[in-house]
Amino acid sequence: MIRPAPWVGAGHRGRGGEAGACTESLGSESGDVGCDAAEIDQFFPPAPAAGGPDDAGAEPCIPDLAAAAAAGKRRRGGFPPPMPRASGPLFLRAERRGGRLILTEVRADERERRVVFRAERDGGRLRLRFANDGDGPEAAGGGGGAGGGGGELCQVAAGRRGVQVGAVMMGAI
C-alpha cells in the first residue's frame, strides 16, 4: 500500500517528523542527511523477505527488458540539436560590453569570408596567418620562418577591418 505523502516545504521539520526531516540537509558537503535509521524505517518500512507468507500464490516478477530499455532512452534523452555552423554568409561577432559577452550575427561578403586565414606548414607546425586577398603567406604574416610570435599575429589582426581575435595559440600540433 502506498501512502500519499503530505506536502512539506523544503527543509521543513514538522510535528510528526515528515519527509522533510530526512531531506533537510541534502546537498551538504559532508553527505550527512540529518536523520537516523529509525526515522528512515518509520517512513519506508523494510520489505518482507522473499518466500515469506505474503509471497504464497504471487506471480514471480519478470522484468520487461523492452520497457526498461525504453525507459532508459527516455531518461538519457537524445543528443541536443547540432549547433549551426558559419557555413553560409553569416557569422557571429563577439564583443565585450560592461563585462558581458555580446554575440552579434553579421552578414559577410562570401569572398571576404574565405580569405581570413592562410594555413602553412613550417618546421612540422601548422601556422594560421591572417591573409589579404592578393597576398601570399609571407606578406600576410610579416615574415617567414619560426621567428613570428603571437604579438605579430595580433598586430595584423588590429590592422584588418572586421576581424575579431579571441585568442592566438602558438605551439606544436
From Swiss-Prot:
One record GO biological process: regulation of starch metabolic process
Region (Disordered): 1-31
Pfam family, one: FAF
Function: Involved in starch metabolism in endosperm. Acts as a modifier of SUGARY1 (SU1), an isoamylase starch-debranching enzyme involved in amylopectin biosynthesis in endosperm.
Family the entry assigns: Belongs to the fantastic four family.
Name of the protein: Protein SUGARY ENHANCER 1
Lineage start: Eukaryota, Viridiplantae, Streptophyta, Embryophyta, Tracheophyta
